[in-house]
Amino acid sequence: MTTNNDILIKVEGLKKYFGNNEVLKGINAEIHKGDVMVVIGASGSGKSTFLRCLNLLEEPTDGKIIFDGIDINDRNVDINLHRRKMGMVFQQFNLFPHMTVLKNMILGPVKLLKKSKEEATKEAMELLERVGLADRANDYPSQLSGGQKQRVAIVRALCMNPEVMLFDEPTSALDPEMVGEVLEVMKRLAKDGMTMVVVTHEMGFAREVGTNVVFVDKGVIVEQ
C-alpha cells in the first residue's frame, strides 16, 4: 500500500504553451517511489513535453512539480541540484562523440558529485559489466551499435545515483533487432526498484513492467 510519504513526484495543474499553442492543459499526476509510469499517446499528444517538464528541460507555463517535497518550478529553487537526482535518457543517446565510453560515464560523477576518478571508474565499470559492455569501455560512441549506445546512455545516467530515471522514447531511433537489448536493461532496472517515467510506443513493455500506464491525448491524461 502506498502512502503520501511514498510520493516522489507530484504534478499539479501542469500547463505548457508554445506561443499560443497550449500543449499541456492542466495535468495532474503522482509518481510513487518504485513506480514505473509508462506514458503513451499519439505523436503530438504532449507526452514528451510532459516528461521534459519533470526536470524543467521544458519550463512549465503554470503548475507545480513537487519533487522530494520541493516545488522545483519555484524560481528560487536551484534546479541543477534536483536535476542531478533525475537521470534522463534521450531518443538520440546524446553521448559525447569525442570521449570514450568510460570518459562519458565518469564525467558527471567527477565534475558534479566530486567523486575521485578511481571511485567513479570502479562504479562505471561495474555498471558496464551489468549491461554486458565492460569490454567496450575504451571505445568511442561511433564504434558502437545503436543498441549499445543506448545501453551506455542508461548506465551513464545511473552513474549519478539518480532517484528517478526519465526515458524519452528510448527505443524509437533503434533498428528493430536492437530494441530488445535496451528494453531488457530497463526491465532489470524496474525489477531492482528504480522509479521510472517512460515515454514509449512499446506496448509489451508497458503491459509487462508498467505499474501505472497513462494515456495522453491533446495535452491531457485521458486514462490511467
What do the predicted segments below correspond to?
Residues 6-9, 15-224:
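ABC family nucleotide-binding domain
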